[in-house]
Amino acid sequence: MKIVFLGLSITSSWGNGHATNYRALVRELSGRGHDVLFCERDVPWYAENRDLPRPPWGRTALYDSVEQLRAEHAEDVAAADLVVVGSFVPEGVAIAEWALETATGTTAFYDIDTPVTLAKLRGGDREYLAPDLVPRFDLYLSFTGGPTLEVLEEEFGAHRVVAFYCLVDPDAYRPVAAEKRWDLGYLGTYSDDRQPALKRLLIETARRAPQLSFVVAGPQYPPEIEWPDNVERIEHVAPGDHPAFYASQRFSLNVTRPEMRAAGWSPSVRLFESAACEVPVISDRWEGLEQIFTVDEEILIADCAQDVFDFLGETGEEESACIAGRARERVLAEHTAERRCEQLEREVEAVPAR
């Protein structure tokens, strides 16, 4: 197939969890023989932090404006068998309208932020999607599964809504040998709504356990945050360094944004990445998680700092290795780029011809 992605960013992972997802997907699709073009808005904050300026798979095109995108890539969109518009694309409504009008093949909205999208649609926020556009896509690929799929169909008229969870590239995310530097680590960009959970599960645990070491990696954390002395801060970890970063932790913490926790069935890309690196994961609790991983066998669930403290103190090396190994096996079986590409191919094939 000829496939065009109109996505947030594939060239920069700075503050952008979409990047590793897109990279793995484009790499796998290209490897399966598809002709893939990724169009990305050239914005200063990504331009200054490009860790993959020229992706080696498919083609990548940068554009400065919607007008430039239309002028230079109308033929690509019109000729594509599949056009995928992603969430959080700058001027996404205008781009989606143009893509839907121009495309002659299958169209899909790839929502890597489904609960946030629903909140925006209900609140009249047209940052990257509008309610009237939802039914016009042939496919709605949702980061979130569970009851949210019915909401998209019944409340917004979406067609062929499918749970299209985040994915991991097993060649990029794999176990590596590294000295254990931290007892618990977290990788993620700062978010106002996610910070209370990070404070509850990591910062408070660090205060209770000054003899242990912790790390929080990611950009945009405000300077006024009071970090305990045993919490190390790292501004950015490039994707190529993620496996070594994870391997340097005894446990990795997964924290979910409130909208996604409320919706449930919203596994993050970091969750799959750390599991693929065979590091045991401690996660906050949300509905549907038990369908992604078997609790206590493939993942540990914490509601408060005491839970985390107990896991760190009571889970032996052999037990944690077994948990990590089982989680990696589950990810490799169900959540790789190969599995998602197979799913995408099936879904596109099932869309009725225009």
Task: Locate the predicted segments by residue.
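Catalytic binding pocket for nucleotide-activated donors in carbohydrate/polymer assembly enzymes
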Residues: 7-15, 21-24, 30-31, 37-45, ...
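Extended catalytic core of nucleotide-activated donor transferases of GT-like folds
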Residues: 4-9, 15, 22-27, 32, ...
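Hydrophobic residues at beta-strand termini and immediately following loops
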Residues: 164, 187, 302
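Anion (oxyanion) recognition and catalysis
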Residues: 30, 100-101, 108, 206, ...
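Short, solvent-exposed loop/turn segments at secondary-structure junctions
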Residues: 9-12, 42-46, 88-91, 113-116, ...
